[in-house]
Amino acid sequence: MKKHSPISFRQLLFGLGFLLTFSGMVLFLFSYRRDEKRFTNITAQMFVSDMKSNTLNMHYHLADPAAFGVTDYTPVLSCYDAKAALHSQAETENTLAALKAIRPKKLSAPDAALWKLLTRSLENTLALSGFPYYEEPLSPVSGTQSNLPILLAEYSFRTRRDVEDYLALLDQTDEYFASLLVYEQEKADAGFIMPAAFLKEVRNQCDTIVTKEALETDTHFLQTTFQERLAPLLKEQIITAEEASLYLAQNDRLLKTVLLPAYAALGDGLLLLEDDSVLPAGLASLPEGQAYYEQLLISETGSYRPIAEIQQMLTEQFSLEYEEIKKIADTYPEIIEHITQDNTESFPFHDPAQMLLDLRSRMAKDFPALPGPDATVTVKNVSANLEPYCAPAFYLTAPLDDTRANSIYINRSKTPDGLELYTTLAHEGYPGHLYQTVYHNRCFLDAGLNPAAELLWYGGYQEGWALYVEFMAYDYAASLLSEEGQKTAAALAQLEARNRSLQLCLYSLIDIMIHYENASFDQIAKILENFGVTDIGSARSIYNYIVQSPCNYLKYYLGYLEILSLQEHARTLWGADYTDYHFHRFYLDCGPADFLSLGECLESYEIPDPTPASSTAFP
């Protein structure tokens, strides 16, 4: 038997060193994995819990919930309850504490970025929860009473389960509206009652959006669209003819016996709250209204700039736009006589499909192509019942996992043809919301990123982009008109762009005046008079709209200015390597996010290869 040699001191030291190194590596890897595992567990729980708590929201986020771990859910509308709101606040505090216990440096780069976004978002949510009755879910501008029917009408049916979920949600609309009425009653008791004039507007909407006459004649859009959505399921034999008939009967019954009475009960309840002594006023008139406005501004726009700095940005941009308007008018003096004329017939395109095709062609060199197959879009008109209460146009966001079919709604009562329709389609379609959404969703899935990111919403990021590309579309239109030999019309398109920018800038400044500085109607009317708005009714409409929708104009226009600021910084950082294509790809790849996070991302951003693999080139 061979005798073992004794271990030398040097060998012993080497062995101990190896063991210590190995142990350190194990602890190091364990530490990293522990933080990653905790983050994965927390975010998975957040995502599934959020999806299960609101089926309507889940359906618009996910086509196939089970593929994202959302199973065994019960169809539910998220009804208001004061105790539930307090419980939700406590859950948010616990989640935030759990996230802050995680060390972001020990997460992967995508998870570390998400950690930052989640913590900032939850901090803002908690800050806003300290103002329980400042929010207005029944705003006359875009409240639940007008938004819910659209969401129901566009609720896609891919499976039998989708139809049954939809009917279950429709059956809960009475409880849902009743809970909103409770909120309004609690709000009134707390001294935050909605002005009587606004309550009258909401009641009028309740009386006209769903009517007995339309339901009795089977002409209401919630009847006709339901039948249209069932047809493909019947054709593909996902449901039988007998099942389709039963579903149709059930839908009619619920519309007549649940939704219609729900609207009536809501309107009657709001009537009891009307107090003619309560007049429209900004948030600054409320206790701690300025503090709430500051927090709401962060939430709605994603900008963390102080209000004084925002006012400075707006004032400087206003002066710039004003000077540009003067230059155009001086260069093309003949343009003045065309300003008040209807030029829609002279615009080269009248069909929305032609306009979208032209937009896609002109944007091709400056925007990354969509990954994967083409995304179809259907342009629809808003139902006549909803025209008075809807925005001029809107894009219904496609689910994360199904971007094949997309819908853009045009409110024909507020959006004429010609140049305005062209730029509106750019805002809502290409290169606006539709393009931004499809690009994000497909890249997100291809990269296998954490679905909890889909819980985050950044209005300034989205609407700022849509306004940014809308202004690009005015340039596209000017080029198109020049190609057609319409030089004056091309100059007019440039003037329209500058005028729209000036108007949105002015309204954004007025938003701050009303909600932060407590400007009265008389003060705002005087300002508007200086800019040509001499009709007192028009001034009142502008004032009321801004009172009803604080930060709404800023969501668009401050978002737009933040993008311009990022773009200017990118030019400085990248120097000769800067192109609009690279900047647009940065913005799309690093978002959605708040602008503070986007600025941080820009500092370390490396310009990638120009064309992603397996992409759909624009025509």
Task: Outline where the language-model segments fall.
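N-terminal maturation segment of proteins
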Residues: P6-P619
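Short, Lys/Arg-rich, polar N-terminal cytosolic tail immediately upstream
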Residues: M1-K2
